[in-house]
Amino acid sequence: MSFHSFYQRASSLFKAYPSTSKILLLSTFSGGGGVLVYSDSNPLKRILHADATLDSDGNPIRKKKVVVLGSGWSGYSFLSYLNNPNYDVQVVSPRNFFLFTPLLPSVTNGTVEARSIVEPIRGLMRKKGFEYKEAECVKIDASNKKIHCRSKEGSSLKGTTEFDMDYDILILAVGAKPNTFNTPGVEEHAYFLKEAEDALNIRHSVIDCFERASLPNLTEEERKKILHFVVVGGGPTGVEFSAELHDFLVQDVAKIYPKVQEFTKITLLEAGDHILNMFDKRITAFAEEKFQRDGIDLKTGSMVVGVTADEISTKERETGKIVSEPYGMVVWSTGIGSRPVIKDFMQQIGQGQRRVLATDEWLRVEGCDGVYALGDTATINQRRVMEDIAAIFNKADKGNTGTLKKKDFNSVVKDICQRYPQVELYLKKNKLKNIANLLKSANGEDTQVNIEKFKQALSEVDSQMKNLPATAQVASQQGKYLAKCFNKMEKCEKKPEGPLRFRGEGRHRFQPFRYRHFGSFAPLGGEQTAAELPGDWVSIGHSSQWLWYSVYASKLVSWRTRMLVISDWTRRFVFGRDSSSI
């Protein structure tokens, strides 16, 4: 190519670009000392889109904008596993760190420092090439695919603190807020245990109670009131906090505040019949017996009806009477509810009558395209087998004979189990090897079944449907699952890998989310922990405590946090807990 033809070609390309691009190119060419290389594949496009992902023709691919709300278990897990260069990822969260929430009760009494269980999110953002904004989403405009954000409360930034963001895909991972059940006085007078700030506030309050009770000129009744600690809720959080607080009283308070130790009291209130009712009955029984031996006042069947600055009132189920009791501090851990931004979003998309935001089995928000919800933010609305029973039968009955042979049924067995996880749960509960055994039990020795026998065989399967627990384990698995789906989005669009569509043609793009339970722990104090592991395996005692140490240390998200937490545990063993209020 001659210099003249090169000049004409370059000139025409130059004129085709906007003025800002021309300025950039002129600045580059006029800087001197550079090398100008010509290529027939459009050199200006290569210069302007050097960092962009290009298609086979060299054209830049527009990246889909993925906005992630939240930096908790599900959000952090999603961001950690996402590896697809075709997404422009923006993260919005008022918390610029990931918090290892299972160790929050240990922060309340100084066993572990708060800084030891947080991992700054900026490191992950830098590593992945994502952008982060420290702000809170206060409004979701689903129809226009926008979110309205406000900078973190208490920010000292001057000027506007609000901004809007567009999105192509929205990931809701904002978690949940404590549920007070509209009980009067709870918001004003009780402490919660959801954030690092909550744990630190409880820690300071506990120390302040002992310092106030140590002051002179107080009556015995006043000291008893100040040192009465009430925990509302007999779930894992309430039980673990009660156990941690009892250990602090026995192991540290006796040395630090010997004159007031005799006035301390811990009361655990539970509206149900038992504490830890989601665990094996053996664990529940052991926990209740241990708390009674430890002197923790366990009251089941007690529903809190009001909290004032000085008293907590409960309604006793057996007698129906309302009893009021003075207290020094109340910790509330009775469950979770949707955040205001999620409630408003639910109204927009027709889910206003629901208690929790609903998604399908692929974590897509029902009634709103391009929005996913993870963790405590939502619950999976698992489709029932009986809703699709006729479609399943017709899909298997390829010859339209009105009956199914074993061969016909076997062709869709795998897809049924993948699409409806409750089928597998039902088989395990009834000790059946496969669905064929289920059909046999309903049809006797017949080799064929009609639609009525088919319905009869599967009629009880949906009884095994249950909501997933609001735990870190579930949230983390959901984040990882969704990230892996995004990583292979383009591949699965061409070659779907999910189960058959019983209503319609083809297959679902991905396998639906399937939760795998790896076990649960319930620390009970005194270096004893209850462990419930898959396979109906229960372990209680000191050995389970060491298993708890090893599992939690391994689940921390970085070596930095592992080293800090292990050093905190070591410090506690050697020197005791930190009782300072800073």
From Swiss-Prot:
Gene Ontology CC terms: extrinsic component of mitochondrial inner membrane; mitochondrial intermembrane space; mitochondrion; peroxisome
Positions of disulphide bridges: none
Activity regulation details: No effect of calcium ions on activity.
InterPro entries: EF-hand-dom_pair (IPR011992), EF_hand_dom (IPR002048), FAD/NAD-bd_sf (IPR036188), FAD/NAD-binding_dom (IPR023753), NDH-2 (IPR045024), NDH2-like_C (IPR054585)
Induction: Induced by chloramphenicol (Chl), erythromycin (Ery), paraquat (Par), rotenone (Rot) and salicylic acid (SA).
Subcellular location: Mitochondrion inner membrane; Peroxisome
Gene Ontology molecular-function annotations: calcium ion binding; NADH:ubiquinone reductase (non-electrogenic) activity; oxidoreductase activity
Superkingdom as given in the UniProt entry: Eukaryota
Sequence ranges assigned to domain EF-hand in this UniProt record: 384-419
Residue sites binding Ca(2+) per the record: 397, 401, 403, 408
Span of the transit peptide along the chain: 1-39
Membrane topology per record: Peripheral membrane protein
Binding site for NAD(+): 227-263
Entry's cofactor comment: Binds 1 FAD per subunit.
EC number: 1.6.5.9
Recorded catalytic activity of this chain's protein: a quinone + NADH + H(+) = a quinol + NAD(+); a ubiquinone + NADH + H(+) = a ubiquinol + NAD(+)
Gene3D superfamilies: 3.50.50.100
pH dependence of function: Optimum pH is 6.8 with NADPH as substrate and 6.8-7.8 with NADH as substrate.
Similarity comment: family membership: Belongs to the NADH dehydrogenase family.
PANTHER family membership: EXTERNAL ALTERNATIVE NAD(P)H-UBIQUINONE OXIDOREDUCTASE B4, MITOCHONDRIAL, NADH DEHYDROGENASE
Protein name: External alternative NAD(P)H-ubiquinone oxidoreductase B4, mitochondrial
Protein species of origin: Arabidopsis thaliana
Lineage of the species this protein comes from: Eukaryota, Viridiplantae, Streptophyta, Embryophyta, Tracheophyta
